Amino acid sequence: MKIEHYQMLAMRTSQEGHDRILNGCMGLIGETGEIVDIVKKWKFQSGDHAELPKDKLIDECGDVLWYCAELSTGLDTSMAKLYIKKNHLFDDMTKIHKTAPLEITVMRLAAMSLRPTMFLFDGIPEQTTRNIGVDYLEAQAKAEIVGIMSTVRDILEIHCSTSLTDAMEHNIEKLRRRYPDGFDPERSLHRIE
């Protein structure tokens, strides 16, 4: 699945008429927290020989990607263009992720998920925003989306033996089952998996 196709399909389940930037930022923080929780439970609560719950990790990585799509759409940009344009900057990050334990990588992911919020919502005084420029702040948030996507890609490839695009397809199939006619708040509250 191509990233631009994923973004279009993912937004089929986005709720109309809400603040996509705020929802995207909050969702990234929440979903990366779920990834951290999966790894924490695997590492510290499952015993020495427990197998990493890769299916759960893939599910949550897909949810992080959904919120990347939501935030990108809110910023009126293409995930694919961001990812292709900036991905070469993250080659060194991938080298680190290949040697770092998974728990360190997911903590980095969680820290990255906070940064778009910092750039877009941290209560920067209006005068400062005018001086720095909204375009600069949005550019920083877009760079963080790429960092998040690159880190998710590395988690998927290194620790789950799957690709970013496979996780995107998995996420879209999950959303089609959950919301066959598009987003429905009632189905969101009373999920049947």
What are these regions (language model features)?
Residues M1-E193:
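Flexible "arm" and connector segments at domain edges
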